[in-house]
């Protein structure tokens, strides 16, 4: 179960202590547990959402979104911000784009992107709370993290060295595909035809975003993986809110 704890520590802000430095193989296997980590986060959000029943709707939605961000420690929002800055500032150049991604400073495009994504998430969460739906609290975190697994399964990692390289190099491909299939089946069983619609929308978004990465970078980075997660979570919320 060490790969699960590695995934939970890496993807979230929960106080997880590992017994020692994991091996590259254990890091690679941790990717298999990303959808399960999403299910853990979704379960925690479901419990928090239940506690807030009866609260004013806008406050309810704002608190759920805040808890959502805090669970991940803002890790993936940081990747989204870096990717937004790099995509605009890179002017189509691969090396310039990668260089901007490594810059810790956030430019105006990063700020605008974060505001828009969080605003849309808030609006979708508010609409879903008003409709008394709750399955979205599980679907969005699970699909977002399953997308990261899918990205590493089928996309080269373009930064040599570091954690991302170990994840990409030591990910078990066969079990990874089985985990993705099991995740898709679970989503359909959980949400029925709504789950099918969500999966179709997310598949289109996934392949479009992956194509952008391949054209610009020839692969993915940790930042673009985080951006993918955030945007697919948003796609889940918007799809369910509009159904």
Swiss-Prot record:
One of its GO terms (biological process) is cobalamin biosynthetic process. The chain crosses the membrane at residues 31-51, 55-75, 109-129, 133-153, 188-208. Its cofactor is Mg(2+). One of its GO terms (cellular component) is plasma membrane. Pfam families: CobS. It is found in: Cell inner membrane. Keywords: Cell inner membrane, Cell membrane, Cobalamin biosynthesis, Magnesium, Membrane, Transferase, Transmembrane, Transmembrane helix. Pathway: Cofactor biosynthesis; adenosylcobalamin biosynthesis; adenosylcobalamin from cob(II)yrinate a,c-diamide: step 7/7. It is a multi-pass membrane protein. Its EC number is 2.7.8.26. InterPro entries: CobS. GO terms for molecular function: adenosylcobinamide-GDP ribazoletransferase activity; cobalamin 5'-phosphate synthase activity. It is an enzyme of class 2 (transferase). It catalyses: alpha-ribazole + adenosylcob(III)inamide-GDP = adenosylcob(III)alamin + GMP + H(+); alpha-ribazole 5'-phosphate + adenosylcob(III)inamide-GDP = adenosylcob(III)alamin 5'-phosphate + GMP + H(+). The keyword Phosphoprotein does not apply. It comes from the Bacteria. Belongs to the CobS family. PANTHER family: ADENOSYLCOBINAMIDE-GDP RIBAZOLETRANSFERASE. Joins adenosylcobinamide-GDP and alpha-ribazole to generate adenosylcobalamin (Ado-cobalamin). Also synthesizes adenosylcobalamin 5'-phosphate from adenosylcobinamide-GDP and alpha-ribazole 5'-phosphate. This is Adenosylcobinamide-GDP ribazoletransferase.
